[in-house]
Design a protein with these regions (language model features):
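Intrinsically disordered, low-complexity segments that are common in secreted/host-exposed effector
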Residues: 8, 35, 41-62, 225-229, ...
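Active-site catalytic motif of lipid deacylating hydrolases and related acyltransferases
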Residues: 2-53, 71-148, 205-213, 232, ...
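Short beta-strand-to-loop junctions in surface cap/lid or active-site-entrance loops
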Residues: 58-72
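Lipolytic serine-hydrolase domain surface
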Residues: 176-180, 185-263
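Serine-dependent carboxylesterase/thioesterase catalytic core
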Residues: 131-215
C-alpha cells in the first residue's frame, strides 16, 4: 500500500513538473490540414465529426467492432483516450496510407475524457486491468498462439494498455518472438523486457510523451526515437513527422522498413 501511495505521489509530481508543455498538445502546425483529426473534411460527414467530439467529452460511443480474421501477419491499432470509432478509422486509414499494413481494430473504447483519464491513472499507477484490457489481451494472445506475426501500433493511452498486455503474456510464458510493438507518444511509465521487438516514438514538446516514455526512458524496453516536435495528435504530429523521417536515428527503425516506397 505504501508503494502504491508513493507511486501515485510520484506520478503527480511528474505531471506537474511538465505542465509547461501542456499548451503544446495541439502543436503549432495547421490543425485543419489533410488527415487531421480536427479537420471536418477528414470525416465522412459533419455529423460524424460532431459525434466524435461529443464522445470524446461524455463517451457512450459503441466500440468499433469488426470481424477479425487471423492472417499470416496481423496488424492491430490500439488508440488512446477520447477516440471513438470515427477517429479510430481516421487514424487507421492514415496508418494504411503510409505502411504496407491492413490494420485491424484493437479499439480502446472512449468513455469520455474524465473516465478515460481515470483509466490511465488506474492502469499506469496501480497497474489495474479492466475488462476491456483483458478483451484486447485475448485478441493478441490468439494471434500469437497460432504462431502468426503480430504487430501492434499503440498511441498515448494505448501505450499503457499494450504494456499491461505484454506483462500478462510474459506471466503466461507465451512465446513473443513473433510480436512487434510500436508506440507513439506512450503515456506508460514502462515497457517490459522480453523476447519481442519494440520501438517508441516521442515528440520532445508533447506533454503526454514527456510524462510517459521520455520521463521513464530507463524503464522502457526497445529503441526510443525522439523528434524535436510539438503536438500529441497521432496523424498530424506523429505519423506525418514519421513520413518525413524526422526522428533521431530513424534509419535504425524496423518500422521504417514497412513504409511504402511511394510515401
Amino acid at each position: 500500500m505504501k508503494f502504491l501511495r508513493n507511486q501515485f505521489l510520484l506520478d503527480i509530481f511528474v505531471a506537474v513538473k511538465h505542465l509547461l508543455y501542456l499548451p503544446y498538445v495541439f502543436g503549432d502546425e495547421q490543425l485543419f490540414q489533410q488527415n487531421s483529426e480536427l479537420n471536418p473534411k477528414s470525416y465522412n460527414n459533419v455529423a460524424d465529426m460532431l459525434i466524435s467530439a461529443k464522445d470524446s467529452l461524455i463517451g457512450f460511443s459503441s466500440k468499433y467492432q469488426k470481424q477479425i480474421e487471423i492472417q499470416d501477419t496481423n496488424v492491430y491499432f490500439l488508440n488512446g483516450i477520447c477516440t471513438n470509432k470515427n477517429v479510430w478509422l481516421l487514424n487507421a486509414k492514415h496508418i494504411e496510407s503510409i505502411f504496407d499494413f491492413n490494420v485491424q481494430p484493437l479499439h480502446n473504447k472512449t468513455k469520455g475524457v474524465i473516465p478515460d483519464l481515470l483509466e490511465c491513472i488506474f492502469g499506469r499507477t496501480f497497474d489495474l486491468l479492466n475488462y476491456e484490457t483483458f478483451c484486447l489481451y485475448y485478441t493478441v494472445l490468439e494471434s500469437l498462439k497460432l504462431k502468426k506475426k503480430t504487430i501492434v501500433i499503440a498511441h498515448s493511452q494505448g501505450g499503457i494498455i499494450i504494456a499491461q498486455i505484454v506483462k500478462q503474456l510474459i506471466k503466461q510464458n507465451i512465446d513473443l518472438s513473433l510480436l512487434e510493438v510500436y508506440t507513439f507518444a506512450s503515456a506508460s511509465d514502462e515497457m517490459p523486457l522480453g523476447n519481442y521487438h519494440c520501438e517508441h516514438f516521442a515528440n520532445t514538446k508533447d506533454y503526454v510523451a514527456r510524462i510517459g516514455v521520455l520521463e521513464y526512458k530507463d524503464n522502457f524496453y526497445g529503441n526510443i526515437f525522439i523528434g524535436e516536435h510539438k503536438g500529441h495528435l497521432l496523424n498530424i504530429h506523429y505519423l506525418n513527422n514519421f513520413k518525413r523521417n524526422s526522428y533521431s536515428n530513424i534509419h535504425n527503425s524496423k518500422l521504417l522498413s514497412y513504409k511504402k516506397p511511394t510515401v
